[in-house]
Amino acid sequence: IVGLKPFGDESDNDMYMSSDDYAFFLTKGFNIYYNDYLRGDFVSVRTFDNYISLANGNNAEQCGMNGFCSNQFVVEGDGSVYPCDFYCTDEWYLDNINTLSFSEMYRSPKCVEFIKSSFKLNEKCKDCKYFYLCRGGGCKRNRESSDYCDAYKQFFLQSEDKLKQLKK
């Protein structure tokens, strides 16, 4: 199954989608979603639901699509706590729930840095007409991985008006 590159993977491998392939996937998938919606046969697709919300001036409900992180504490079986399920790594280990409260971890320098680091924005995003939809690649883990910027631009170019037409 062809998929998107995992974050941090810079390899050139045929098992990962190219930017053009990903643009095709997004556009084709959204057109199916859109046509089903118009026929009254709506099935929620979280990514598209969130793009509709963003296109209509609202926030996304999925934390990663707002362009910055929020704390989504993950507690492992041994009590280890991390700020997000995508960052259960030694680097982002906050503490153990048996020794420190959530509010103490929330105010910890490491947790504050986790959130602060998510606001870093690529220079090319600052003047992009689709920033209000893309939010600089959304979740910071997506910004760390291979660049699908062109895919999103192609998708938004073809779908922006339809996204604005649908309201949740």
Region locations from a protein language model:
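Radical SAM enzyme [4Fe-4S]-AdoMet core and its adjacent flexible, acidic
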Residues: 1-68, 74-77, 86-97
